[in-house]
Every structure is written in structure tokens, then in C-alpha cells.
Amino acid sequence: MKRFSALLCTLGLACSLFAAGKDEFPAISHSELTAAMTAQTVTLIDVNGTASYRNGRIPGAIDYATLRGDLAAALPKDKGALVVAYCGNEKCQAYRTAAKAVAALGYTNVKHYSPGIAGWRASGAAVEKGAP
């Protein structure tokens, strides 16, 4: 019985940690993101790699792959400023790498754009191409 109780406690803890991690970086909707872009109150981080970044990115996004060593220099001074990371699509979790790095620098308003570049393109929104 003690083993069973210990197993249940362990499973419960694991599930609660997984659930907490899932919402660690809340999603931002397409309309919220475009409003923040229009107001110029967001820093966007593309986590798709440099080749993908040059092939098409959300306008104004920075390339995480080229900034890893100097990410802090590309971010706003205000640690409460909105920072949004995105990757390929809704199934992609690569955004977490950048989001965690940003949070580790002390930023408190870190979100992710779940549809990623695929969803952005599917919405008909413009993309930037080439080097920044």
C-alpha cells in the first residue's frame, strides 16, 4: 500500500510539473500580435534557424540562431516588455529555447506565437525575406 501511495504521489507531482511547464510561456493570438506589432511594443524572436529566417519571417523578427551569444543586446531595456518567440507551426516546441533564454535574462512578459511562421503565412500576412 505504501508503494502504491508513493507511486501515486510521484505521478501526481510529475503531472503537475508537466502542466505548469506547458503554460510557462502563454500563447499570444494573431490579432494580439499584430496589434503589438502596429504599436511597436513587441520584440519578436524567430527560432527557425538562419536559412528559414532568410526565406521568410514575421516582419521585424530577430534571428535567434545568430544572436544566441548576444541575445541581451537585441532585447529592450525594459524587463517587462513583451517578447514573443515563435518557430515553425503549432506542433513545434523550439520556441521554448529562446523563451527560456529570454526569461533567464529577467524578462517577465515572454509569450509564444503558437501558429509559427506556417500559421503567419496561412493567414495571408506579409513576410520579410533576406538578411535583416
Regions of interest found by a model, annotated:
Residues K2-A6, C15-A27, S31, R54-A85, ...:
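Rhodanese-like catalytic fold shared by cysteine-dependent sulfurtransferases
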Residues S29, A36-T41:
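Extracytoplasmic/periplasm-facing segments of secreted or lipoprotein envelope proteins
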Residues T43-N48, A61:
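Short hydrophobic beta-strand that contains or immediately precedes a catalytic carboxylate
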Residues Q40-L44, K79-A81:
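Short coil/turn segments at beta-strand junctions that form active-site/ligand-binding loops
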